[in-house]
Amino acid sequence: MTVYYKGFPQSDRNEAIKMVNVDELEDRVRKVMPEAAYYYIASGSENEWTWRNNTAAFNHFQIVPRSLTNMDNPSTETQFMGMDLKTPIMICPIACHGIAHKDAEVATAQGAKAAGALFSSSTYANRSVEDIATATGDSPKFFQLYLSKDWDFNKMVFDAVKSAGYKGIMLTVDALVSGYREANLRTNFTFPVPLDFFTRYVGAEGEGMSVAQMYANSAQKIGPADVAKIKEMSGLPVFVKGVMNAEDAYMAIGAGADGIVVSNHGGREIDTAPATIDMLPEIAAAVNGRVPIILDSGVRRGSHVFKALALGADLVGIGRPFLYGLALGGAKGVESVINQINNEFKILMQLTGCKTVEDVKHADIRQINYTADNLPSNTDPSVRRAYPVTKENQMEGTQDAATGASKH
């Protein structure tokens, strides 16, 4: 069930996961994942207010039930940018899936394919875009770009992504430098597994680098001209990822963006930034249907997916939960996570008389002044729990927190 890369424990599971909801996976994954690796995934920046509020803010919106709709068997299938999907839930790009599973992004993409969901791969992925494409065929795939200062590197990435059959690029614009992530500092987190594009271009594997060091390789300034240049060089649709206000949405569309991703990087960059769901109505009104909108950050329930679609999103991304599924069950675990949230979403479609995803976009949502900010912060010493020590979450041979193991 566990293999080791230079002493770093990696799951090799491939099994469906039984769960009541995806939240319960966060405790379960601590038993199979090293402490630093877990906190790299789970934590946010500074006091983690935004990380917590991203989920809590969905309680600002109420779903108004509908009855006497004479409808059954709703369909969660949808189309997006010419791609046929079984669900409006997508896999968000996250770096280094190898901290969760030995097959890394290949297993994640296989799980997304099985669930009929759009998969997106990170510039800082462990596995190559070619390996992922070979394992998943023509299943829908996007690529997330951390723009490099080196345009030769960028061109190499664009050519590889297009040749591998990816359907679009998500340009990340909200992470020009790393947010101040205290949990990563406390555990001395560094990437324990090589990152493909670093290996093939600069000969530096990325292994052993901190998050801040990794971001230092990326462009520290991005403007509208970069969006146009990426479109021209790549020949692919470009979504601007990290839009949190109407003005930036206008600028992105004006620069030629083919889509908008409403995201605050999962609460990992600016702490006390607004929750994405709170900003979505304003941004959707500004976009006014001119380009598709994706929302991510804080999504944990089918009701969150429903609310995001009703408030203006076309797809809804999940991040941390699928990595927990990857660690606990490999490709089948990722599929289980997507199916769990999608099944919750389908129940709400039935209870609101929504036969299709398009119907959900016209559902009745009411905003209220309410919050339920009851999630503990990973950085608050008063609520930090002792990290469990198990055979599966320890380094092989040595105990070195810098590469992800606990010291107790």
Swiss-Prot record:
Identify the SUPFAM superfamilies for this entry: FMN-linked oxidoreductases (SSF51395)
- Positions of pyruvate binding: 40, 146, 181, 265, 268
Reaction(s) the record says it catalyses: a (2S)-2-hydroxycarboxylate + O2 = a 2-oxocarboxylate + H2O2; (S)-lactate + O2 = pyruvate + H2O2; 2-hydroxyoctanoate + O2 = 2-oxooctanoate + H2O2; glycolate + O2 = glyoxylate + H2O2
Family membership = Belongs to the FMN-dependent alpha-hydroxy acid dehydrogenase family.
Per the entry, what this protein does is: Oxidase that catalyzes the oxidation of a broad range of 2-hydroxyacids in vitro, such as (S)-lactate, 2-hydroxyoctanoate, and to a lesser extent glycolate, mandelate and 2-hydroxyoctadecanoate, to the corresponding 2-oxoacids, with a reduction of O2 to H2O2. May be involved in the utilization of L-lactate as an energy source for growth.
Listed under subunit, the entry gives: Homotetramer.
Q: What is this protein called?
A: L-lactate oxidase
Q: Which organism is it from?
A: Lactobacillus jensenii
